[in-house]
Design a protein with these regions (language model features):
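Conserved PLP-binding catalytic core of the aspartate aminotransferase-like
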Residues: 285-316
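Conserved N-terminal alpha-helix of the aminotransferase class I/II PLP-enzyme fold
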Residues: 34-80, 87, 102, 110
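PLP-dependent enzyme catalytic core of the Aspartate aminotransferase-like
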Residues: 1-5, 318, 331-361
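A glycine-/small-polar-enriched, mobile loop at the entrance of the PLP active site in fold-type I
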Residues: 4-55
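PLP-dependent aminotransferase-like
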Residues: 78-146
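Active-site C-terminal subdomain of aminotransferase-like
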Residues: 16, 195-276, 359-361
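Active-site phosphate-binding strand-loop segment of PLP-dependent enzymes
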Residues: 11, 111, 122-178
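Conserved active-site segment immediately N-terminal to the catalytic lysine
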Residues: 171, 185-196, 205
Length: 361
């Protein structure tokens, strides 16, 4: 096998090489059963054992309390933008949303189709370069829930704190930062995460839902989108995305082997500091985000001259540094350094950036 590239893609993102090799070894013959996971009945003892272990490993990693259900559902976070209000927002109720970037805005736009949405805070006055402090928020006393995105992958903002919402359930889109450092699940009513950044391949979404929030779906909510139906059926009301579920389980196993979320969080801290410290000391590269709000997972940066963007990307690809082009809506560069992107990848990127600056700075 030729040397694997360093993949800085925002999603679908890098997967641990050990997970890929394990999946490769089991692809044609899972545990001597003579068939692939892709060919198994989702109701077979074999796949049920895979699903059960994946859930337990995730519970162990995040210390999920027993009064929370863990769901493995089809689709991604964008589907949750509709599924959440269909399950949690009463017909005549309202929900509070926090706007810190493009993904927050997509959630707001979709929820507005199903009821009243109060944008309780927005980063717009800060040009989305900083997160408004909670003293600036205007939360509703009667909100059904408060929704926010702890990490905005495109803008590169990340909450370094958990909002206080009292008795109002806090709903978090953790698609891009789940499992990147320890969290207290009990502070949330619901956590959801599309898999293709820090969990596994695309096509599956993980929902961690407090039990008292189940059973309140609207009458018009499709059966397939009802969280209680999913919970009552072990996430198997219909045939689930079995391969993605299995691969996610392998990632959970790998994370436990690395020492769990606390250990991976320390590694992620080293990675993000290595990259930001280099950018801040550079004369060619810059990051516009307020330092207290910088994302650990998604690091956007610009070159002083946009005309250097193309040669920078060409040189990066020649060195096996892939998918560094920034999102089309903001331009520049973006390095996504999720759990599976190790410090060697970050060091290789910094080394190339220094070399490029020496030639073009």
């Amino acid at each position: 096998m030729s040397k694997r590239a360093y993949n800085f893609c925002a999603g679908p993102a890098a997967l641990p090489e050990a997970v890929l090799l394990r999946a490769q070894s089991e692809l044609l013959d899972w545990h001597g059963k003579g068939l692939s996971v892709m060919e198994m009945s989702h109701r077979s003892d074999e796949f049920v054992s895979i699903a059960t272990k994946a859930e337990q490993d995730l519970r162990d990693l995040l210390n999920i309390p027993s009064n929370y259900k863990v769901l493995f559902l089809q689709g991604g976070a964008s589907q949750q933008f509709a599924q959440i209000p269909l399950n949690l927002l009463p017909e005549n109720g309202s929900a509070d949303y926090i706007d810190t970037g493009i993904w927050s805005q997509k959630a707001i736009e979709e929820a507005s189709r199903f009821g009243r949405v109060n944008v309780a805070a927005t980063a717009k006055p800060y040009d989305y370069f900083a997160i408004p402090g909670q003293n600036e928020w205007k939360l509703s006393q009667d909100a059904a829930y408060v929704h926010y995105a702890p990490n905005e992958t495109i803008g590169g903002l990340e909450f370094q704190w958990v909002p206080e919402t009292g008795d109002v359930p806090l709903v978090a889109d953790m698609s891009s930062d789940i499992l990147s450092r320890p969290i207290d699940v009990s502070r949330f009513g619901m956590i959801y995460a599309g898999a293709q950044k820090n969990i596994g391949p695309s096509g599956i979404v993980v929902n961690i839902v407090r039990e008292d929030l189940l059973g309140h779906a609207r009458s018009l909510c499709p059966t397939m989108l009802d969280y209680k139906v999913a919970a009552d059926n072990g996430s198997m009301y219909n045939t689930p995305p079995t391969l993605a579920w299995y691969l996610s389980g392998l990632v959970f196993e790998w994370l436990k082997e690395q020492g769990g979320v606390e250990a991976i969080g320390k590694l992620n801290d080293v990675k993000q500091r290595t990259l930001y410290d280099f950018i801040d000391a550079s004369g060619l590269y810059s990051n516009p985000i307020n330092k207290a709000d910088r994302s650990w997972m998604n690091v956007p940066f610009r070159l002083a001259d946009d005309r250097l963007d193309k040669p920078f990307l060409v040189g990066a690809e020649a060195r096996g540094l892939l998918n560094l082009k920034g999102h089309r809506s903001v331009g520049g560069m973006r390095a996504s350094i999720y759990n599976a992107v190790d410090i060697n990848a970050v060091n290789a990127l910094v080394s190339y950036m220094a070399e490029f600056e020496k030639e073009h700075g």
